[in-house]
């Protein structure tokens, strides 16, 4: 079920369920408030909310304790090549925007717990038990292994609040409420697989091979691609599932050559994907390769090189696009691109994880101010309130914050879309396919058919089946 969304653009409305995400480890969990790696004072302590006027929950008026924001980070494991970039994405909106005038007067202090070695469940526990995190960033594809622990923690503490950039493997009907306050910036992984098939069909591909590494989010997206292909009428010649982080995929490239598909749908990390394509090109193949959002990371082209691009029919990724026509983008883009330690190290503002992380963190902070509290009970409904009409439309953190403090309702219009979320806490984004140019640069995004995407995602979306005690299977 979809919450009401304003009609700033018909495409955004149609894409309420057509959501895209990539599935996505501790180098020492030092607190940071500036560039990644900087240290500050001791971690914040959790402050119990009180009830203010009008029934809103508010923090104690004299509280200036820092708020511990703990990122579930990727410094080891399959996603290690871009772990530092993902951390910069979290630090940027906090250091450069939010902490200039933090919500409720409490500065945010960041910690980064590597999940690549110890696992996501242990990293999340460390955030809560050692750092007293009031905000945990990016619960992700390992959530099912510790959901019971989190539900108990939320029930006992009414905390933490959870904006997530990598939560697309979590079913769309989980989240978005005080008892499970997860809000996802980029959508659902099954829509990513579907989008790849939609693009393949749009270029006339009648047959595909689906290649996926054995990571939950990639497996989910690959399964969705199979279902979407069946719904559309595209023939899946084979699905090839392989372990992640292998030094070579030459045998798989040879099998793809023997199958001779019109296109290959790839659900794998940037390095594995580039290795496969490079080895396929060396074997003489020329195909359309349709990947996932991680390909935007520099490691993809760094591993692939530019020579294979010219030899292939097409190389690009199905993802989502940004809205560069609003004041929100006019503020964000130059700030990212010109601030040392961000654009100069991790690529331009147009890279997907940069702008999607920025948007969800800004909306998180605005919802805290609007709620008057860091409690999940107050924050979860506030995430809807600050992004949905009615309210004064606003585009930047400072502008929106001033309106909230003046007692006005706001309607935040961000850079990923209208700021609206489904009842399950999934952001509405605009699906697209983005090609690579011959020099390795990113080309112009192709927006996919919104109505067709909506029809298909309703057929293939994964939902959790839950009992009366909120024990869920998926």
Which ranges hold each PLM region?
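Extracytoplasmic ligand/sensor domains, especially the bilobed periplasmic-binding protein
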Residues: 132-244, 288-315
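Hydrophobic alpha-helical segments within soluble ligand-binding/sensing domains
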Residues: 120, 184-209, 220, 248-250, ...
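Segments of small-molecule ligand-sensing domains
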Residues: 342-351, 367-445
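Extracellular/periplasmic periplasmic-binding protein-like sensory domains
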Residues: 280-361, 368-374, 453
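Bacterial lipoprotein signal-peptidase II cleavage site
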Residues: 25-33
